UniProtKB/Swiss-Prot annotation:
Keyword Ribonucleoprotein: no
A single cellular component GO annotation: cytoplasm
Organism (species): Methanospirillum hungatei JF-1 (strain ATCC 27890 / DSM 864 / NBRC 100397 / JF-1)
Encoding gene (name): alaS
Cofactor(s) essential for the protein: Zn(2+)
Protein's name according to its UniProt entry: Alanine--tRNA ligase
Positions that bind Zn(2+): 611, 615, 714, 718
């Protein structure tokens, strides 16, 4: 379908021919017309191990060589983006350099930061997680060196021929022989786009992919091209999307046995020494086997095949027993994986991802716990993880990370503690599950194992070991972690049907509503023309001061005054497309009327104060707690508001006080609030992606709000000066989910009202004790201490009473079994003590205590009489229910007038059970 796309003038001018690979059947371009294979693994094994392709370079040297080369070719070098894709709402991690420019640049909404540009972008992909360390080439975290050009009808930068020419020139500049290079045709599809691409292969290794993104799913007037059953249409932009693997270039320049030896020499050596394998680094036989293994391990694809089967193939090819290869290679593969994972965690945590059980935090915890599991296999202490991550951060360069390394270490230490707790608790959960499936004579399903990991954090290896010891059967796929990562790699897009969408077609002919709330934020009254009324309930004006619900801020309410002098209540305001709808409560508003709108001033001012205070609190929390603080949600209200923030531990009372003090100092500084519409690309380059605390707004221009150091893209209404807020009072902090803390607060008059409420509570409490407020802490402590002592005395007396009652109780003998059925108005613990005193001797007891409700305890020392059955009968008479074990059950009911009837029913049940 795309064959014509690869007929490049550059290929022809350089004398390349198009051949078909005898192994995979795919087309490729080569300078050697006699070449039969494409040069990709597994069609061709690695040729560069021990025989480097490029001049030897380190990671830093290779990166600089690449970026400098493209700068000399007219490209602008730009800084890397974070690995946490804060500017995207569809993915959590930056998976490619082009992801930096999606969706707004690639769709043509905004211009690129430079054109053409070059970048070396750290990326994280976890879809091959189980292959890392084993294949010799897979990484979770890698740098995608890239050059991008964005071509339009108005401006052509360069396209396919120049892209391939630049690739050839780069490879040659690094010392490669062009005659060895092949370009393999590979139609590319991803993220709703498509286009031709070529894989750049040399020495059996794919070192780059050159994608020519020119097709999209959005329908245009031009005819579509069908790919994999889906029609794709020519895009407005034609984008050069290249990806050169930095680590693969370094590997090919050194010819080392694996990519890990080339990229992480210091870390591999360090971890090998720590694990007791340091001597192997100087063992020539080991190095030889490692190199031979790496050549064929390039064929390994963990998905679809078992590790053991693949290991057998490699062992056979290099001529050693499988068990010997496994014993030699497996621990080293774990070392490689640990080194890779700790670099991945350095970027994740250094770029302010907080481990949790959701979103990007889930993925960080997944990698972290997998690392700990492998460390334990090598007998490396858990505490060593923090040291390894710190070493990686220093190698990369601490200045390249936003997060303070000390905070990273604290996060890691806490995650290690959580992992230990999970492992301890998980054992009991797994044992129960194993017993269940053992009784069924069934294998534990994979779904159950996934649930154990997803919901409880219990690793699959632990499940297998414990379940096997219990006699249950577990069959784990070798790509378990890759499957889990793929399940959580993308944001779930839930789009609820908005009933107002039915109005969109009717709104299409109307002009955009003029937003007076931006032009005159301090005004509370305005005049406007009624353009449309939907179903007598939703009014569209030509302009409005009413702010529509959005960004966690409720829509404004107020009044309309009609030309007839009638007052109409505005209950809510909603934005739909480019129009603003005012929901009215009855009233006679006519199309074409000029109405007067009046906002509920107190409510609007309160919402403005709370919205501005939200920005200030977020900034204060970041100042007190660390750079990782990121908004996880917010809701503004008239009387109180809340903001959810990502944090790795519970906020302490002392930290809460500091946040409140910092916030109020910012209020008292009375700084001006700056609001301006800016080009998205310019704003991102100036302020970073902390702009998108409240989500990613659409459009080429975004409304940037600067409040006391906090800078965000925000559509809400704000105070002109921080001093207009008055004061901020934090009401409470709540742990809403793992890794998320909620601050509830009040601002302005609402904060004063909250303070008054707190004072009222204190005064009423002081009055109850007949003391001054200042004496309340000491007095309440004294009363509490006295109450505890009195409770102990009461418990002693109750225990003594129950002992005396037990001695004086007369039981009834039914067929040689002592039965006690009686009302005893004692606390529950004493009722249980009396009842079990009877059942311990083989008897049966039914005891009921009165009060506001009836309380029942049944205890049975007879297998033929289950306490749970008896209590159901007794409690049913009382209008309640109960339950428990066969030997002891408790319950009750609200109808205390039926206690005697309930006792009689219970006794009758026992007599029947004992055949009396």
């Amino acid at each position: 379908m795309m064959e014509d796309e690869y007929q490049l003038e550059y290929f022809k001018s350089e004398g390349l021919t198009r051949n078909i690979c005898s192994s995979c059947g795919k087309a490729f371009w080569t300078r050697n017309p006699d070449r039969m294979v494409c040069g990709d693994a597994p069609c061709e094994p690695y040729q560069f191990i021990g025989n480097p392709i490029f001049r030897a370079k380190t990671v830093d040297e290779m990166r600089e060589a690449y970026l400098s080369f493209f700068e000399k070719q007219g490209h602008t070098r730009i800084d890397r983006y974070p690995v946490a894709a804060r500017w995207r709402d569809d993915i959590y991690l930056t998976i490619a350099s082009i992801a930096d420019f999606q969706p707004f640049v690639t769709s043509g909404v905004v211009p690129p930061p430079a054109n053409p540009l070059t970048i070396s972008q750290p990326c994280i992909r976890l879809n091959d997680l189980d292959s890392v360390g084993r294949s010799g080439r897979h990484l979770t975290c890698f740098e995608m060196m890239a050059h991008h050009a964005f071509n339009s009808d108005e401006k052509e930068i360069y396209w396919k021929d120049r892209t391939v020419e630049l690739c050839d020139q780069l490879l040659t500049s690094l010392g490669a022989n062009k005659e060895m290079v092949t370009y393999k045709e590979h139609p590319w599809i991803g993220g709703g786009n498509a286009g031709p691409s070529v894989e750049v292969l040399i020495g059996g290794l794919e070192v780059a992919t050159l994608v020519f993104m020119s097709l999209g799913k959005q329908k245009t007037e031009k005819p579509p091209i069908e790919l994999e059953g889906t029609p794709y249409y020519p895009m407005t932009l034609r984008i050069v999307d290249t990806g050169y693997g930095l680590e693969r270039f370094v590997w090919a320049s050194q010819g080392s046995p694996t990519i890990y030896d080339a990229v992480f020499p210091e870390m591999v050596s360090h971890v090998m020494q720590e694990a007791g394998f340091g001597h192997r680094l100087h063992d020539s036989d080991f190095i030889h086997i490692l190199g031979e293994n790496a050549k064929f391990a390039g064929l390994m694809d963990i998905s679809g095949q078992r590790i053991f089967e693949l290991r057998q193939k490699v062992a056979e090819k290099i001529g050693i027993p499988t068990d010997k290869l496994e014993k030699m290679i497996a621990p080293v593969e774990s070392v490689y994986a640990i080194v890779d994972h700790t670099r991945c965690l350095s970027y994740m945590l250094g770029d302010c991802i907080v481990p949790s059980n959701a979103k990007d935090g889930y993925l960080a915890r997944l990698v972290l716990r997998r690392t700990l599991r492998m460390m334990r296999e090598l007998d490396l202490p858990d505490e060593k993880l923090g040291d390894l991550i710190e070493r990686q951060m220093k190698i990369i360069g601490l200045s390249k990370f936003e997060q303070d390394p000390d905070v990273v270490m604290e996060i890691v230490d806490r995650e290690v503690d959580k992992y230990r707790t999970t492992m301890e608790r998980g054992a009991r959960t797994v044992e129960r599950l194993a017993q269940t499936y053992k009784k069924k004579c069934e294998k534990i399903p994979l779904d159950e194992i996934i649930t154990l990991y997803d919901s409880h954090g219990i690793p699959p290896d632990m499940v297998k070991d414990l379940a096997t010891s219990q006699g249950a059967v577990v069959d784990l796929p070798d790509d378990f972690y890759s499957r889990i990562a793929n399940m959580h790699s993308e944001s779930e897009q839930i789009q609820e049907k908005n009933p107002l969408f039915d109005y969109l077609d009717r709104l299409a002919h109307l002009p955009e509503t003029r937003k007076l709330f931006y032009e005159r934020p301090g005004s509370m009254e305005f005049e406007a023309k009624v353009l449309e009324i939907f179903d007598g309930q939703y009014v569209v004006l030509d302009q409005t001061l009413f702010y529509p619900e959005g960004g966690g801020q409720p829509g404004d309410t107020g009044l309309f005054l009609t030309p007839d002098g009638l007052t109409v209540r505005v209950c809510d305001t909603i934005k739909l497309g480019e129009s603003i709808l005012h929901r009215i409560d009855g009233g006679n508003v006519r199309k074409g009327d000029m109405i007067r709108g009046i906002l509920d001033e107190d409510r609007r001012l309160s919402l403005m104060r709370h919205h501005t205070a939200t920005h200030i609190l977020l900034h204060a929390a970041k100042e007190v707690l660390g750079a990782h603080i990121h908004q996880a949600g917010a809701q503004k209200g008239e009387y109180s508001s809340r903001i959810d923030i990502r944090h790795y531990k519970h906020i302490t009372p002392e930290e809460l006080k500091k946040i409140e003090v910092v916030a109020n100092r910012l209020v008292m500084a009375n700084s001006s609030t700056s609001i301006a519409w800016e080009d998205r690309t310019d704003a991102e380059q100036k302020y970073g992606f902390c702009l998108y605390q409240g989500g990613v707004p659409p459009g080429s221009r975004i409304r940037v709000v600067k409040v006391a150091g906090d800078i965000e893209a925000c559509a809400g209404t704000h105070c002109a000066h921080t001093g207009d807020i008055g004061t901020i009072s934090i009401i409470r902090v709540e742990h809403v989910q793992d890794g998320v803390e909620r601050l509830e607060f009040a601002a302005g008059i609402a904060a004063i009202q909250h303070k008054h409420h707190q004072e009222d509570l204190l005064n009423r409490s002081a009055e109850a004790f007949s003391v001054q407020v200042e004496a309340l802490p000491a007095t309440s402590k004294r009363f509490f201490d006295e109450w505890k002592e009195q409770r102990k005395e009461i418990e002693k007396l109750s225990s003594r009473i129950s002992e005396l009652e037990s001695k004086n109780l007369e039981t009834v003998d039914y067929n040689g079994i002592s039965v006690l059925v009686k009302r005893l108005d004692l606390p529950n613990p004493e009722l249980v003590k009396v009842a079990t005193g009877i059942s311990d001797k083989g008897g049966i007891a039914i005891l009921v205590a009165g009060g506001e409700t009836a309380r029942v305890v049944v205890s049975s020392g007879q297998k033929g009489v289950k306490a749970g059955d008896v209590i159901s009968t007794v409690c049913a008479v009382l209008g309640g229910k109960g339950g428990g074990k066969p030997t002891l059950a408790q319950g009750g009911g609200p109808d205390v007038s039926k206690i005697d009837d309930a006792l009689a029913a219970g006794e009758s049940f026992i007599k029947s059970a004992l055949h009396v």
